UniProtKB/Swiss-Prot annotation:
Belongs to the glycosyl hydrolase 8 (cellulase D) family. Keywords: Carbohydrate metabolism, Cellulose degradation, Glycosidase, Hydrolase, Polysaccharide degradation. GO terms for molecular function: cellulase activity. This is Endoglucanase A. The gene is celA. The keyword Hydrolase applies. The keyword Hydrolase applies. GO terms for biological process: cellulose catabolic process. Its EC number is 3.2.1.4. It is an enzyme of class 3 (hydrolase). Transmembrane segments: none annotated. It catalyses: Endohydrolysis of (1->4)-beta-D-glucosidic linkages in cellulose, lichenin and cereal beta-D-glucans. This enzyme catalyzes the endohydrolysis of 1,4-beta-glucosidic linkages in cellulose, lichenin and cereal beta-D-glucans.
Length: 14
């Protein structure tokens, strides 16, 4: 992805 949607990981699983 390109936007931080997860609080644990900045960008989550891309």
């Amino acid at each position: 992805a390109g936007v931080p949607f997860n609080t644990k990981t900045p960008y989550g699983p891309t």
